[in-house]
């Protein structure tokens, strides 16, 4: 059996229509009121839903704004933190720079004090230097026996000595101390030999040239010769052997000591030293009297030296001539010229007279030039 639902539904609709037609007008009013109430409810519910949606939207919007505000606050706080850190770093750098500036200022003050101290020391030394220089000059004058006008400029001469000093001379300076003792022994031997020599002098040949003493107080004959010479010694015609050397006070150039070896037991000694004022001048001092005939090359100069005990020679041939038997008692200008040609006859001698061997004003003799023949 089959059930027809469509017919049943149509029947139900028909019945409702019939009921509606025969219903009273009051029933129609009630139905309309119900419909209106339902519509109002729906409207109210819709308005509520719309309000709720609006509130939700507003709430969401406010939440977004709050989040944005929070984010902005966080950004502001982070930026403030960065600014504070940068400011702190800048402050630390400024403090370090200030500390460095203070240390530099302290160093500058120290350096200024040192500079001021050095300037004061320099001024004191500059004030003391002339006094020291004067005292040195006075000591040198007392040592050389020179008065008044014979002042020596220590500074300029020291520079010249340093420039003109040869390496051999510098090597010889170091031997001075070890040879002083030997020199004293030689001087004692010389005193004994001179004592014997005085007794034997009468038996010697009268034609043999003798050495004239430069002062009456000395026992030995002593003659001083100054010659311009570049070598360590000048060739004076005799044979010599070096036995000592030392540096004298007031003259940095060493003084060399020689003895005559022409004959055994000859008491003649010579001392050789550079001049303090002019390093090109070689000062030779001869002491004693030869106990043998002189060589041919030495006789002429021996006779010349006997007439003028203090001589300055200016020779272009480095004094290949003769013998001189002397050292400087007083140092100053006397001049003999020797041309290279040995046959040249005219010689000029300018001699000086002195009051003593170690002191004196330099007074020229009345006969300044003596002409003599070879």
Swiss-Prot record:
* Extent of Acidic residues compositional bias: 63-77
Offer an example of a GO molecular function term for this protein.
sequence-specific DNA binding
Subcellular location per UniProt equals: Nucleus
**Basic and acidic residues compositional bias: what residue ranges?**
40-62, 161-193
Q: Which domain of life is it from?
A: Eukaryota
Question: Record's GO cellular component, any one?
Answer: nucleus
Q: Which Pfam families match?
A: WRKY (PF03106)
Expression induction = Induced by potassium deprivation.
Key word Cytoplasm present in the record?
A: no
Q: Which SMART domains match?
A: WRKY
| Positions in coiled-coil regions | 87-121
- Gene3D superfamilies for the chain: WRKY domain
Entry keywords, A to Z? Coiled coil, DNA-binding, Nucleus, Transcription, Transcription regulation
Spans annotated as Disordered: 40-90, 157-201, 355-374
Whereabouts does the entry annotate DNA binding, in residue ranges? 229-295
Biased-composition ranges, Polar residues, are: 363-374
Classification via PANTHER family: WRKY TRANSCRIPTION FACTOR 36-RELATED, WRKY TRANSCRIPTION FACTOR 9-RELATED
The task this protein performs is described as: Transcription factor. Interacts specifically with the W box (5'-(T)TGAC[CT]-3'), a frequently occurring elicitor-responsive cis-acting element.
* UniProt protein name: Probable WRKY transcription factor 9
* Taxonomic path: Eukaryota, Viridiplantae, Streptophyta, Embryophyta, Tracheophyta
